[in-house]
Each structure stands twice: as structure tokens, then as C-alpha cells.
Amino acid sequence: MGKITDISELEYDFLFIDTPPYLSNHLPKLIQIADLIIIPIKSSYLDLLAIQSTIDLIKSESKIDQTLVVFNMIKANTTLTIDILIGLEEYNVKIANTHISDLVSFTRSVLVNGVKSDKNAQKQLDNLTKEILSALI
């Protein structure tokens, strides 16, 4: 088993590590070596409260400038997203322009091998991909 610090030596263009902040005692080391930290958030007050400890940890590692908050599972025709955006202002963290909607296509994607048949879902993923790649360049 290698060390976390060896990750940057791996021959990959992209490496995604998906973990809830409370499950990894290695999170500070992972944050230190990350080129970009993506924090998904739903439009809920509980998620807004839960994100604070993650952002505090990222700030303690001086990586807030390499952090991007991405809204996920956004409900249509609600003001919740605006409320959460206002709540996030105090954290002084970059928020992705692309929001991922709560579309049935995303839920079904595991069963049908993607979202190719839903142009709206595909457009959201394409836009988010471009935004992430731009943040890395």
C-alpha cells in the first residue's frame, strides 16, 4: 500500500477521490495535494450547515482558492438555491456557474448507461466539465 503523498506521482491526468469529510482521517493530506477540490452541495439548509466544517478544513490547509462548490440535485421552480447561495457568501468560496438539476435522467443513468438521450442533462454535464477543466488550467 502506497502513501497518500505518492498520489501525485501516479501517471493519471485526473484522479477523483470521493469521500465524505467525516470518513477520512487522511483528508488534510488529500487537500494539500489536490489541484482542485470540488464540494457538491444540495439546496438545503442542512447541507449549508454541513459544508462549514469541510470549508474550515480546506481553509486550514490554505486551499480555498482551489475549491469549487457545485450545486447538485437542484429542484426546479424553488427559491432554495438562492437562499443557499446567499448563505454561502460568508464562506468566500468560488461557486460553479453550472448547477446540476434533479432530473430523472440522472437517477436513471445507472440503469441505462448514462444520460445520452437527455439533451438537458448532457448539456449540464458538458458545461460543468468545461468549467472544471477551465479551473484546472
Question: Where does each model-flagged region fall?
Answer:
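Conserved C-terminal guanine-recognition region of P-loop GTPase G domains, centered on the G4
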Residues: 49-72
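Inter-motif core of Ras-like GTPase G domains
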Residues: 22-44
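Beta-strand-loop-alpha "switch" segments that mediate conformational coupling across diverse proteins
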Residues: 75, 86-113
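C-terminal boundary of histidine-terminating zinc-finger modules
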Residues: 108-132
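Short histidine/acidic/glycine/proline-rich micro-motifs that form metal-
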Residues: 43-45, 72-77, 116
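P-loop/Walker-type NTP enzyme "switch/lid" segment
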Residues: 1-16, 21, 110-114
